[in-house]
């Protein structure tokens, strides 16, 4: 969830790169030191294999034995994503935060690829759907975002960067967090003013 969403909490601090802290958490995990495999394929998203290798280098610098397993594009979304315990993935935007959270993070979601399960998160999501007080609803989404950041298993190196250049001579334009050119709808929703 990023600033394209109206209920985004811009006070959530970005995590800093801290190999010493990562090493501390890894040692405390009790992991046996065997290689941790990160599955990636070029088709996961543009630059997925490079991103996985950069992440592995950062993890290795902290003493975490992460290795990248290159998977074929063919069958990646059927045989690797949401099957392998640790793999590269790509999420495009959704029209509203509720849909993103419901699709990927609520405990019962079929596409919950991090296997995140948190009863408080689920309760907040359900409550926020029916909350009419805008400030309270924003606070509920903020609490959900904090829970995800602190307890979720997602490693998020970047957000999609949709750069929109629009002339003053174009009418009907609205920002859309789902994709470039109003999620592909600019040609049917906009006109020359």
Where on the chain are the PLM-derived regions?
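Detector for C-terminal structural segments
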Residues: 1-7, 23, 44-56, 74-193
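Immediate post-signal peptide segment of exported/extracytoplasmic ligand-binding proteins
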Residues: 19-37
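Short secondary-structure junction motifs
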Residues: 33-35, 63, 152-154
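Early extracytoplasmic/lumenal segment of secretory-pathway proteins
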Residues: 65-77
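Short alpha-helix C-terminal cap/hinge motif
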Residues: 54-68
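Short, well-ordered beta-strand elements
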Residues: 33-43, 66-69
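DNA breakage-rejoining catalytic core of tyrosine-based enzymes
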Residues: 11-17
